[in-house]
Amino acid sequence: MVDMSTRVVQISDCHLFTDPDAELRGVRPHDQVRRALQHIREHEPACDVLVISGDLAHDELRPTYVVLREMIGDWVPRCRIIPGNHDHRESMHDVFAEIVTPEQQEVCFEQQLPGWRILGLDTHIPGEVPGEIGDAQCQWAHDQLSAEPDCPTLVFMHHPPFSVETPWLDKIGLRNADRFLELLKPFPQVRIVCCGHVHHEFQRDGNERQYLTTPSVAVQFRPRTKNAEIDTVPAGYRVFDLHEDGSYETEVVRLAPAG
């Protein structure tokens, strides 16, 4: 019997501007995102789902989402998006209408895969840096998880509901992390919770569940620091291979330095 597997590629924290020459902490996000998407097309041709886990834009302007959509091109149908603290929900609904659930204010998603489900949750609070899972989103997540209690599930969200052992970043994570983790307790099928926001790779295992973060495709932050420090490691993205039997592998792929 042939094992059916699905390749999910996650990029995070694009921080795009409408102006392609705009810089953020010494890098041009426009160039970085274009390089990342080109690398994924060349090296991950088996990509079935492309997840962008928040901070698609930095300036929160509608034209910036149009720029990103043009970069993604014919891969838009396989793309799934959730907002970060720098995003603008209405623009995401408008520009990516065919991949965003129209009847919800939140920008979230659910997708059934062979042997797995993936969920994307909206943790955006307009005008603030930390995140939160609101009442409506908690109920939606509960309903989704209750519907398929035996299906291994991968949850994406922007703000980590766990410590990344970096004090200044832990202060701007998910405000109501305890509520979210309590919500997950009756649902052991949630095998992985994977986030962005912190601009570096992190992994923690606990309670038969893996907690991950994925580096930015733009600027990298040095982990385990008291204050924000830029790291010199290359930008990257994460790849998941989700197998029909419920097993999986994941790794972070780093981009070669621009030159």
What are these regions (language model features)?
Residues 1-67, 71:
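N-terminal active-site segment of His-dependent metallophosphoesterases
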Residues 10-12, 48-55, 79-85, 122, ...:
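Active-site neighborhood of phospho(di)ester-bond hydrolases with catalytic His/Asp-centered motifs
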Residues 13-18, 47, 116-123, 160-163:
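Short, basic/glycine-rich phosphate-binding loops at helix/coil junctions
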Residues 16-20, 58-63, 85-93, 126-129, ...:
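Active-site environment of divalent metal-dependent phosphoester hydrolases
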Residues 22-28, 127, 166-172, 226-228:
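Short glycine-enriched, charge-decorated loop/helix-capping segments at active-site entrances
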Residues 35-49, 130-210, 246-249:
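His/acidic metal-ligating clusters that form di-metal
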Residues 62-147, 152, 176-189, 207, ...:
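Extended active-site neighborhood of metal-dependent phosphoesterases/phosphodiesterases
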Residues 238-259:
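A short C-terminal boundary segment appended to hydrolase-like catalytic domains
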